[in-house]
Amino acid sequence: PRSTPNPSSAASDVYKRQTQYRETDWDFLTRLLAESGLAWRYEHTQRGVGAGADDSDPGHTLVIFDADAELPSPVRLRFHRADASEAEDSITALGERRELVPNRSVASSWHSERVEAVSGEAAAAHHDAIPTLEVYVQPRAGRFADPAHASEEATFRLDAARLRGWRLEGAGSARVLAAGQPISIAQHPRHGGATLVPLAVEHVGTNNLGSGITALLASPDLEHGSYRNRFVATPVEVPVAPLAADRPTVHGPQTAHVVGLPDAAVTPSRDHQVRIQFAWQRGEHPNPGGLSAGSHAPGDHTSGTWVPVAEWLAGPNWGSHFLPRIGAEVLVEFLHGDIDQPRITGQLYNGDVAPPFAAGIDGGANHPGTLSGLHTRGHDGGGTQQWVIDDTPGQLRTRLHTTLADSRLELGYLIEHGDHHRGSLRGQGVELATAGWGNVHAAQGLLLSTTARPDGASTQMDMAEAVAQLKGAERTAEALHDTLRQQAVPGLDANERLVALREAVDPDVDGAYRGNVAGQPAMKPGGGGGRQP
């Protein structure tokens, strides 16, 4: 192959990811060329003929070029009859075909890393009587690095559309006709002197074998022992640009394994992305059971590119955050069915990875699957943390636990806990325990009370029961204090502090905030439509 792009043309794209999926090598190559606005042609030479040629010359060269590349010098062909008496090949028929095609092209692609759509456009001159006919395309996400790149893509698509707008179709006996080789038309009443670029040539030839073979190979359209062709061409003024090829479509999701740095638990990017390797990838280190090959499946952090991981919630510095770890099997879906736009939408349990709260048929647990929640393990493989939700009818329970200092908080129906086993009853209520140190801080005050109110009525800091008990204790202390003073015994000096404590928590004195909270009154609704502390 020989590449002959114009040096002034934009540099060829460097793709982060290009996957050949259910397409031949040739289809894959030509699709990539078309996406970059590169056309191609074959140059045929007779083996061993020409300057510098030898018998090792294959005689066929694939030439890749863009719309700005300089084409070969045109070959002069006459518009004339084809006859055995003629010394030169000729073109015997030539007609022009016009078609109304788009004259404006717009391309736009969403760039998630920059959180913006990168767009570009291109337009072709057209007659005032023809309205603007726009074609708008949105290639895969992140396709364009900048607006100039998007405008270049729009130009490629516009040039490809213009090829359909002005074409010439002809026929003749010129054996030098080849796609991409310009020709100059002579002696034509309308197109004499025009230079055309053939886009496709169909060759038809018959041999001059004996009468028996000739009868078997008879063709009513062509004389035996002769040659004819027909072709489609475009004026040289129209840029030669390839038509965009359809990308292979992925029908449904696929599974893959997460890969990363050796001996690491997870190898993510800042933007919540990981690297994956599909089961069908062949290479040096394919997935277990995969086929070996020279490349394409390294099994580490060099595999492919970053793939985004979908989450339950995602926002600016808020949302859920659960990255699949190396070796995890993940479910991969593709935007618009494009193999080069994978997105991880979930993780899967399999024969090697069982759920942390396994239950059900053959689960070995003593419950039918009433446990749910989250269970994580340290990156070094030691220690676990979990949030368990037990939905057993009549025995609802929530548990927060970490193996570090065996620290836990349990609410509701308290039982002996196991990941696959519901143990015996230990009580009902709340339990906060740790094998290490513990402390409780409350900057505005802390109330610990054994008084229960039916139905949990009123507000969080309503402590009417505590205030009543403090008032009773205050009256008792005052009575004791008066009795002691009557007997000439020193009184209870702590009484004043008890009064201060009661006033601090009494909503009728100092135990209420009377301002607004988030624009709403801090007082609870009271009888008669008013509010009270």
Question: Language model features by range: what are they?
Answer:
Residues P1, S9-P533:
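Amphipathic alpha-helical and helix-coil boundary elements used as assembly
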